[in-house]
Amino acid sequence: MSWLFGLNKGQQEPPGVPGFPEPPSPPGGSGDGGDKNKPKDKWSNFDPTGLERAAKAARELDQSRHAKEAINLAKVQEETLQMEQQAKIKEYEAAVEQLKNEQIRVQAEERRKTLNEETKQHQARAQYQDKLARQRYEDQLRQQQLQNEENLRRQEDSVQKQEAMRRATVEHEMELRHKNEMLRIEAEARAQAKVERENADIIREQIRLKAAEHRQTVLESIKTAGTVFGEGFRTFISDWDKVTATVAGLTLLAVGVYTAKNATGVAGRYIEARLGKPSLVRDTSRITVAEAVKHPIKITKRLYSKIQDALEGVILSPRLEERVRDIAIATRNTKANKGLYRNILMYGPPGTGKTLFAKKLAMHSGMDYAIMTGGDVAPMGREGVTAMHKVFDWAGTSKRGLLLFVDEADAFLRKRSTEKISEDLRATLNAFLYRTGEQSNKFMLVLASNQPEQFDWAINDRIDEIVHFDLPGLEERERLVRLYFDKYVLQPASEGKQRLKVAQFDYGKKCSELSKLTEGMSGREISKLGVAWQAAAYASEDGILTEAMIDARVADAIRQHQQKMAWLKAEGKEGAKEIGKNPLQPLLEGTQV
């Protein structure tokens, strides 16, 4: 019933309980009316209105039919309040218990901190004591070292003093000995001079007698030799048979010396032309005596080897492959029928397979090949003409026929009218033109150049076939990537002898992707890319070539290729912007494929 007395005003009144009207205010209830000067008692401000309302409400509640429910509701509210108070008491007790636990935890934390601080103090004290002990030990060592150094210094001073005393003693002894020696020499010289002065007449007489005897001996020797040679020459002249035999012998000796000298030169030149290798030739398949002695097994295999396909290992575009195959067949048939060989000019960017095809062409035709570079001609100077004639003389002695491949031919076969070339190089060029003026059945001339427009017109007149080697296309690049990936990666990994393994990924798909990324690269650059993959595998810790390593090497090669192209463009070379452009299109229009 707390709500009757104004308690729990915030709570809602129970349903079913009628509201009680407020009683009217009694007259004069206000404390303001009346005389202000009258003394006030303690009940002067008491308002009985609340008691009246409570009494009235109690009477109405007793008379109401909901009285019992109201009483029960009041009891329930009182029990609820009691339970809330008990809950608050429990919460207070829990808070007190938590506070006690917190105090215990704080005390334990303080105790732990105290123990840690004591431990730190003990450690600091121990470290300080150890530091003091180390300092004392270091001071002792320092003092001991200083004492040892002082003792050593004293010993050195003592040794130096003893050495100085010994040196002074030796010097004094040597000085005394020198003085005694000088006195002795002086005494001997004086005695010798005295003796010579006393015996001067005797000495002069002895010298005079010796000179007279020597002069008499020389004169007698001259007379004896003249007599002997005179008698011999007189005897030789008087006998004409001896004179004739002597003249004939001297003549035969001179003829023999001259013949041996010239025969040796002729034999040397013959051996050099037949068995040796000219200085301008860098590489050749012809068998030399030195090579046969060094590598007999290799030479035997070469002699009994079968004829190879001209395009084995050479990857070209279908049109170019068809053309060079026709050239290979024609060359082979020319050799078989002992006809005249045709001269070929191969031009195009570097690394497109010109040198490789020349070697394969020689092997396919059963011919020997010899490779020379144009850059080796200019440094020879005056010897260039002789060296050039030696090359062609040597080429003419080949029984199987020789394919003479001149790489970088534009280095010395330049235009004589416009290019500034030396007289020696001009003479060498004239010798080359003289030896290639007519077609031969002994050798076949193959020129390779990156700038064929710089050739002398006489060189172009000696060319029978012009072949353009362009950069590989997408299909050719994919074949090249697969070829070198198999050669430098898969084959070494499958052999098991080398430290190289390949991770698991789709090799064919990767080769197709790389062929698209390597646009603009030559066959040589792609082959170097295969070598780079192999080197990357060897350089790794486990020797496994992963796909990421392949991509990294390809990206590096692409950057290097772009840098090279930028350098070519900066140098102003015409072939850098359009590297696949055909500079000899007017000449090729009239050439049958």
Swiss-Prot record:
Gene3D superfamilies: P-loop containing nucleotide triphosphate hydrolases
Annotated ATP binding sites: 348-355
Compositional bias (Pro residues): 15-27
Organism of derivation: Xenopus laevis
Name assigned to this protein: ATPase family AAA domain-containing protein 3-A
Reaction equation(s) it catalyzes: ATP + H2O = ADP + phosphate + H(+)
Biased composition (Basic and acidic residues): 33-44, 53-64
Transmembrane feature ranges: 243-260
EC numbers: 3.6.1.-
Source organism superkingdom: Eukaryota
